[in-house]
């Protein structure tokens, strides 16, 4: 039976959105460990140089103002984007803080004098297998390992940018590996292909087919190339597509949100 799993880099626009939401959460809990946080981030290229919107609910005790949000966003972008484009410019994009106070109904349901309650009902799925050292499903584990190695290469190679995806298919005579990685215009694709093939051999046993950037050139990436939104990569964040997910995202949520 064929099995396919995909992973994405921290420079993928959806994962950048996740990172910003988690940075807001971390700052809120650092300011006050009792902060209640449910943050969503949206980022996109625009005709005026890019937009990042941070919204959701947050306790007043978290004490994060507009300047705090701006710093958080810029810190996250500095770790996940190398290159500015006309429609997403790191030095001039618009950052919009739309955080509002947490609902009093949710607050009263979560907290009382004796117990800590859940902020919502939900479905949570746990999984482990002894087929891999990570206890993850084998195909997903393979994709994830290749992605982590690719991320290191992306950070250390000046000809590569930071948006990428890795897809692995197993179950046939040969494993199929597809990598899409953002790059500079003047990159030598043939040389990159050789380097990535060498890397893949460390994580794939036996023969494999390898496709690099099957859609062609991939210069414009990150939020300049595609919109990013918190919570759109929940399968990647969990155990891959062979294991059910409950449906809730992890990022930007304090521990009273049971899916976190």
Language-model regions: role of each:
Residues 4, 8, 43-51, 71-223:
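Glycine-rich, mobile lid/loop segments that gate access to catalytic sites or pores
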Residues 60, 220, 227-260:
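Conserved mixed alpha/beta catalytic, RNA-binding, or beta-rich assembly cores of soluble enzyme
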